Structures are given as structure tokens and as C-alpha cells.
């Protein structure tokens, strides 16, 4: 299992466009990937799940992956979030 914490910096939080980007990135991997915020955990491959969390700017979230490609998944998602200016 691999996980990483992120601090959301994008002004609009994780709304439709960033959520779609994260779901698309997570869907490339076979591992189970979850997004946790305020004690709630959702499947990062589910757009509705991600949007339902209402993650705003300044939020701290944890993304976890479990499976054969967990380390690659977390690494790629972290790179995407940083490159797109979503989190640090």
C-alpha cells in the first residue's frame, strides 16, 4: 500500500475539471485508489464519489493505493496534481 498527503491550492478546489483529471489518471491503474477527506473515503476512479466530497481550496487530502501498481499510481497522481497546479 502506498499513500501521500496533498494540500489543495487550486482556488476552485476539486470541482469538475480537476476531478475529471484525477479520475482519468487513476483509471490507468489496476490498484484500488482512494481519496480521503474529513474522514470520508471514496474511490478515486469515481467522478461522482470525488465530487461528493466537496474538497475546497486549503483542504488536506490523502490519496492511497493498494495493488500491484500502487507506487506507480501514487507517483503519477502526485505528478499530475503538482503539474496541473492542484496541490502541493
From Swiss-Prot:
Domain HPr: 1-88
Keywords: Cytoplasm, Phosphoprotein, Phosphotransferase system, Sugar transport, Transcription, Transcription regulation, Transport
Keyword Repeat annotated: no
InterPro entries: HPr (IPR050399), HPr-like (IPR000032), HPr-like_sf (IPR035895), PTS_HPr_His_P_site (IPR001020), PTS_HPr_Ser_P_site (IPR002114)
Residues recorded as bearing Phosphoserine in the entry: 46
Localization, UniProt: Cytoplasm
Activity regulation (UniProt): Phosphorylation on Ser-46 inhibits the phosphoryl transfer from enzyme I to HPr.
PROSITE patterns named in the record: PTS_HPR_DOM, PTS_HPR_HIS, PTS_HPR_SER
Example of a GO biological process term: phosphoenolpyruvate-dependent sugar phosphotransferase system
Predominant cellular place of this UniProt entry's protein: cytoplasm
GO cellular component: cytoplasm
SUPFAM superfamilies: HPr-like
Residues the record marks as active site: 15
UniProt cross-references to Pfam families, sorted A to Z: PTS-HPr
Keyword ATP-binding: no
Biological role: General (non sugar-specific) component of the phosphoenolpyruvate-dependent sugar phosphotransferase system (sugar PTS). This major carbohydrate active-transport system catalyzes the phosphorylation of incoming sugar substrates concomitantly with their translocation across the cell membrane. The phosphoryl group from phosphoenolpyruvate (PEP) is transferred to the phosphoryl carrier protein HPr by enzyme I. Phospho-HPr then transfers it to the PTS EIIA domain. P-Ser-HPr interacts with the catabolite control protein A (CcpA), forming a complex that binds to DNA at the catabolite response elements cre, operator sites preceding a large number of catabolite-regulated genes. Thus, P-Ser-HPr is a corepressor in carbon catabolite repression (CCR), a mechanism that allows bacteria to coordinate and optimize the utilization of available carbon sources. P-Ser-HPr also plays a role in inducer exclusion, in which it probably interacts with several non-PTS permeases and inhibits their transport activity.
UniProt record similarity statement: Belongs to the HPr family.
Protein name from the UniProt record: Phosphocarrier protein HPr
